[in-house]
């Protein structure tokens, strides 16, 4: 019985540790070139009005540009960092730039947000 408990405890610890690891960015080829995508293959974007480590996309902006949310126990790496939004939620940033998806991208590989708002939104590129 104690061996089973020890095995279950070890497995729980391993699974908990792996869920807290850093977001691993994936890349995809689009009609506008290679870009970072989320787990669903949706294009990720950066916003020129954000400063390093700070998201200014709140309210209606955040409704149209959902943040790439990080778990409370997310662990950053050298390139992938965690930014705390004004609403207290955590989001991922690549090299200090907060990452977002775009509401009007409906299928994996869509790039409708690139160049939006007079060029203030950009596909996040490797």
Regions found by a protein language model. Name each.
Residues 5, 16-22:
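Sec/Tat signal peptide C-region and signal peptidase I cleavage site
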Residues 21-126:
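Compact beta-sheet-dominated domain cores in extracellular/mature segments
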Residues 1-8:
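Bacterial N-terminal signal peptides that target proteins for export
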């Amino acid at each position: 019985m104690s061996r089973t408990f020890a095995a279950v405890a070890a497995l729980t610890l391993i699974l908990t540790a792996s869920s807290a690891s850093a977001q691993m960015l994936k890349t995809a080829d689009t009609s506008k070139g290679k870009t970072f995508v989320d787990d669903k293959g949706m294009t990720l974007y950066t916003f020129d009005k954000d400063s390093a480590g700070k998201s200014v996309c709140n309210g209606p902006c955040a409704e149209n540009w959902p943040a790439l949310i990080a778990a409370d126990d997310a662990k950053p790496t050298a390139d992938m960092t965690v930014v705390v939004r004004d609403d207290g939620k955590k989001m991922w940033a690549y090299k200090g730039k907060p990452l977002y998806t775009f509401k009007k991208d409906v299928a994996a590989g869509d790039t409708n947000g690139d160049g939006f708002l007079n060029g203030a939104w950009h596909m996040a590129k490797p």
